[in-house]
Amino acid sequence: MNQGRIWTVVSPTVGLPLLLGSVAAIAFAVHFAVLENTSWVAAFMNGKSVAAAPAPAAPAAPAKK
């Protein structure tokens, strides 16, 4: 581990909770942003089905010569 000397500066009893807490806070912020900025995620999480996207139209057959 090339970053092992960090524990000579910061005690693991302080550093690990800070690291894990910051990861949890970032994950919460990302999930909150997704829920606030999309309309379908909240509906999906509440059990509503999402309408399927329409299939693209088939390409036209080439004309015979």
Swiss-Prot record:
Q: What is its main location?
A: membrane
Regarding the membrane, this protein is recorded as: Single-pass type II membrane protein
What does the record give under GO molecular function? bacteriochlorophyll binding; electron transporter, transferring electrons within the cyclic electron transport pathway of photosynthesis activity; metal ion binding
Periplasmic side residue ranges read 36-65
- The protein, known as: Light-harvesting protein B-800-850 alpha chain C
Record family assignment: Belongs to the antenna complex alpha subunit family.
Can the keyword Transmembrane helix be found in this entry's annotation?
yes
- Domain of life, source organism: Bacteria
| Organism classification | Bacteria, Pseudomonadati, Pseudomonadota, Alphaproteobacteria, Hyphomicrobiales
